[in-house]
């Protein structure tokens, strides 16, 4: 896989990112929007010191209700070299972050792997968390097997119609199921040290207004498939933002 024929995500744009943009609107140069110690992630990630988040610019999902649309859709951020990215990873460890959390990393996987190689050679040892929409290719996840400790995927939609309406991705439900299967295969059951997750999968689901039955289907699926072998993070902080402000169904 390379930037001149990009197939990193299920959109399969086949675009030359050195010259043009695909659905995610990202070039071949890594851009990041925010580096922080995040206190409000799941407690087993944030702990007392915070999760060392690195927010990447752009996104392959482009959900119409995105609460980070300035970063994901409008592309707020600045370019960094792979060497500088590796330094940022190490700086998060120096700040006593409990983990290094890569937020919306899918479209920069190739560069992130190179940066993680450099950082690990220089002593990066905290768990690396892959915070993703869940819209991932199994082949790309396989490339991450030696670099990611905790997968933090969304499971946004159960229905193809809902996925099409809100993210223009009708294949999302099938894709995310296969992706989570692969994530679990790669990291296995949850492992903890001092109440901080060292290995495992945490599945997030944001409950959308009027779509509670779909949420119930997702919870049922996760339980029947994984039982106690993954963690489920149900989120109720939906706020109508971005394009959702014009849609009566989810504008409350």
Residue ranges of predicted features:
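Conserved radical SAM core fold
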Residues: 72, 109, 134-137, 155-173, ...
């Amino acid at each position: 896989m390379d930037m001149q024929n990009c197939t990193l995500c299920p959109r399969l744009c086949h675009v030359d990112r050195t010259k043009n943009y695909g659905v995610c609107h990202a070039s071949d140069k890594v851009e990041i929007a925010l580096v922080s110690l995040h206190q409000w992630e799941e407690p087993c990630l944030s702990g007392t010191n915070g999760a060392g988040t690195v927010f990447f610019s752009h996104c392959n999902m482009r959900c119409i209700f995105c609460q980070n649309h300035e970063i994901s859709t409008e592309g707020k951020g600045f370019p960094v070299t792979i060497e500088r990215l590796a330094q940022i990873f190490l700086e998060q460890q120096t700040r006593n972050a409990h983990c290094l959390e890569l937020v919306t990393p899918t479209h920069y996987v190739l560069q992130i792997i190179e940066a993680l190689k450099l950082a690990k050679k220089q002593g990066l040892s905290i768990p690396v968390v892959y915070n993703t929409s869940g819209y991932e290719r199994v082949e790309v996840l396989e490339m991450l097997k030696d670099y990611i400790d905790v997968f933090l995927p969304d499971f946004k939609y159960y229905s193809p119609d809902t996925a099409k309406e809100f993210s223009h991705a009708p294949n999302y439900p099938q894709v995310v199921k296969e992706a989570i299967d692969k994530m679990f295969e790669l990291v296995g059951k949850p492992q903890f040290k001092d109440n901080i997750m060292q290995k495992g999968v945490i599945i997030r689901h944001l409950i959308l207004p009027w779509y509670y039955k779909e949420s119930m289907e997702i919870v049922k699926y996760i339980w029947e498939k994984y039982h106690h072998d993954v963690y489920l993070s149900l989120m109720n902080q939906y706020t109508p933002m971005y394009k959702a402000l014009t849609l009566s169904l989810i504008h409350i």
